[in-house]
């Protein structure tokens, strides 16, 4: 009988232990486990939200970079266009100036040629008169001399 009383005593002690654990030990353990589960769920949700925000931020940053590149390309294209316009304008002005200088040079050469030609005609006429005076042996009067020179210049 002793064996049965020990067994019943152990059963009562075990039942008291289980009741004590269910009353005082299990609730804090369950509460701690549930809090831990909630913290893990919140952390996972926060991580997922942060991951989504990071993806959105990256997409927005990529979009801004693309806009900046497009704007930079527009500025470069505009600057290139403006540079080409300025070059064409300067080249056109230089061509006009070159033509003006060439025409001015031609005009100066032509006027110098006419002046030299006139000077040469007068010298030839003077030489012709001097030669005629030597041949004739006398001097022709100045009025007749001028008439002869004018006719000779006109013929040359």
Swiss-Prot record:
It is a single-pass membrane protein. GO terms for cellular component: plasma membrane; proton-transporting ATP synthase complex. It is found in: Cell inner membrane. The chain crosses the membrane at residues 7-27. It holds the Pfam family ATP-synt_B. It comes from the Bacteria. The keyword Transcription does not apply. Gene3D superfamilies: F1F0 ATP synthase subunit B, membrane domain. GO terms for molecular function: proton-transporting ATP synthase activity, rotational mechanism; proton-transporting ATPase activity, rotational mechanism. Keywords: ATP synthesis, Cell inner membrane, Cell membrane, CF(0), Hydrogen ion transport, Ion transport, Membrane, Transmembrane, Transmembrane helix, Transport. F-type ATPases have 2 components, F(1) - the catalytic core - and F(0) - the membrane proton channel. F(1) has five subunits: alpha(3), beta(3), gamma(1), delta(1), epsilon(1). F(0) has three main subunits: a(1), b(2) and c(10-14). The alpha and beta chains form an alternating ring which encloses part of the gamma chain. F(1) is attached to F(0) by a central stalk formed by the gamma and epsilon chains, while a peripheral stalk is formed by the delta and b chains. Belongs to the ATPase B chain family. F(1)F(0) ATP synthase produces ATP from ADP in the presence of a proton or sodium gradient. F-type ATPases consist of two structural domains, F(1) containing the extramembraneous catalytic core and F(0) containing the membrane proton channel, linked together by a central stalk and a peripheral stalk. During catalysis, ATP synthesis in the catalytic domain of F(1) is coupled via a rotary mechanism of the central stalk subunits to proton translocation. This is ATP synthase subunit b. The gene is atpF.
